[in-house]
Amino acid sequence: MREIVLTQIGQCGNQIGAKFWEVISDEHAIDSAGTYHGDSHLQLERINVYYNEASGGRYVPRAVLVDLEPGTMDSVRSGPFGQVFRPDNFIFGQCGAGNNWAKGHYTEGAELMESVMDVVRKEAESCDCLQGFQLTHSLGGGTGSGMGTLLLSKIREEYPDRIINTFSILPSPKVSDTVVEPYNATLSVHQLIENADETFCIDNEALYDICSKTLKLPTPTYGDLNHLVSATMSGVTTCLRFPGQLNADLRKLAVNMVPFPRLHFFMPGFAPLTSRGSQQYRALTVAELTQQMFDAKNMMAACDPRHGRYLTAAAIFRGRMPMREVDEQMFNIQDKNSSYFADWLPNNVKTAVCDIPPRGLKMSATFIGNNTAIQELFKRVSEQFTAMFRRKAFLHWYTGEGMDEMEFTEAESNMNDLVSEYQQYQDATAEEEEDEEYAEEEVA
């Protein structure tokens, strides 16, 4: 079996993680005590991907829950699925990282790291054939960003050939929780570029927009936002958990989605997004799903894909649908919007189809796009970073934990390089490259 170990770190990571386990448990018909109450053998066939079978037929999530303060852990534990997790897998400090990346990465977080890695090892050892790791965290705070990236580098060190997927909540342009967000995010992206295989960039503002404009929720809560994220997370791994006509796994995704190793930052989307009240009145067609999935309003990162070009994309459909129709629709969308796809990467959309739809829907689709417009997101953070760093504002909090200013400069230039790499491939065309070849031949 292809198992996945989920590590959730920091307040945001744990809240998303908790929501995700609710969604997954519901799909596999597992109740809050870890017992199975379903009627379909499909639910149990590959349940090992996310669950360990314990004595007495209980199913225990392969989750590692980490935080530097006990608060969030307590609320997860007292939440609806709090009793499912293995008690030893809760690892928390007492003092918090106080929104300080350096505390999470170098001091407080580093002290806790050994015990976190012990639990990760234990989980990895109980797998037959470990496919990889998923990490949920935010990049704006201290624990998820600082300690999350430290954990990432440690996992990369011990399991160099396993896929690491991160679901990273980026700071949003209008909604900011903390002043030092740009610092924390830039330092984290610096690490993600080097150590992650796939990073799903999600930001709260895009989620708020989806909730208020598309789902018509008057006052969206974090619970609603996290529900959207967990729908995407469940969609990405659905092919591993249920049988399908065309399968995808984390590695296949990475191979098809990442044309150059540094450019692994994706925008996720999900369809159908309909308000909770109007769900039962609509029967979706594959055409509508495809249309909605590629719509800019459905993107969970606050960037407009129409400002860039798709280097690659993946679409994971769920539900019973004719393959032929899926292929036709995917071809149509690329044909009609060909200017938005990089012409020097032919057939750059990967499709997967899984037969089992999520609860309450006949069919759904998860979209993952590697679009050059994601640079807008990094540009925004970078501008805020530069504005503060030029005045050396708040730096003493970081240098006080033993950090060096050089690290900030390195992180800044790495992120700017990333932006210019995206820009370079956005402008590239197929013709240009042929010309270059001719030019080289003439010189020779």
From Swiss-Prot:
Effect on the protein of changing D417N: In OZEMA2; loss of function in oocyte maturation; loss of function in meiotic spindle assembly; decreased alpha/beta-tubulin heterodimer assembly
Impact when changing I210V: In OZEMA2; decreased alpha/beta-tubulin heterodimer assembly; loss of function in meiotic spindle assembly
Electron transport keyword on record: no
Entry cofactors: Mg(2+)
Annotated region (Disordered), positions in chain: 423-444
Domain of life: Eukaryota
InterPro entries registered for this protein in UniProt: Beta-tubulin_BS, Beta_tubulin, Tub_FtsZ_C, Tubulin, Tubulin/FtsZ-like_C, Tubulin/FtsZ_2-layer-sand-dom, Tubulin/FtsZ_GTPase_sf, Tubulin_C
Modification comment: Some glutamate residues at the C-terminus are polyglutamylated, resulting in polyglutamate chains on the gamma-carboxyl group. Polyglutamylation plays a key role in microtubule severing by spastin (SPAST). SPAST preferentially recognizes and acts on microtubules decorated with short polyglutamate tails: severing activity by SPAST increases as the number of glutamates per tubulin rises from one to eight, but decreases beyond this glutamylation threshold. Glutamylation is also involved in cilia motility. Some glutamate residues at the C-terminus are monoglycylated but not polyglycylated due to the absence of functional TTLL10 in human. Monoglycylation is mainly limited to tubulin incorporated into cilia and flagella axonemes, which is required for their stability and maintenance. Flagella glycylation controls sperm motility. Both polyglutamylation and monoglycylation can coexist on the same protein on adjacent residues, and lowering glycylation levels increases polyglutamylation, and reciprocally.
Modified residues (5-glutamyl polyglutamate): E436
Consequence the record notes for mutating T285P: In OZEMA2; loss of function in meiotic spindle assembly
Keywords tagged on the record: Cytoplasm, Cytoskeleton, Disease variant, GTP-binding, Isopeptide bond, Magnesium, Metal-binding, Microtubule, Nucleotide-binding, Phosphoprotein
GO CC, one annotated term: microtubule
GO molecular function: GTP binding; GTPase activity; metal ion binding; structural constituent of cytoskeleton
UniProt protein name: Tubulin beta-8 chain
Chain residues that bind GTP: Q11, E69, S138, G142, T143, G144, N204, N226
Protein localization: Cytoplasm, Cytoskeleton; Cytoplasm, Cytoskeleton, Spindle
Organism of derivation: Homo sapiens (Human)
Impact noted for substituting V229A: In OZEMA2; loss of function in oocyte maturation; decreased alpha/beta-tubulin heterodimer assembly
Substitution effect: M363T: In OZEMA2; loss of function in oocyte maturation; decreased alpha/beta-tubulin heterodimer assembly
Domain remark text: The MREI motif is common among all beta-tubulin isoforms and may be critical for tubulin autoregulation.
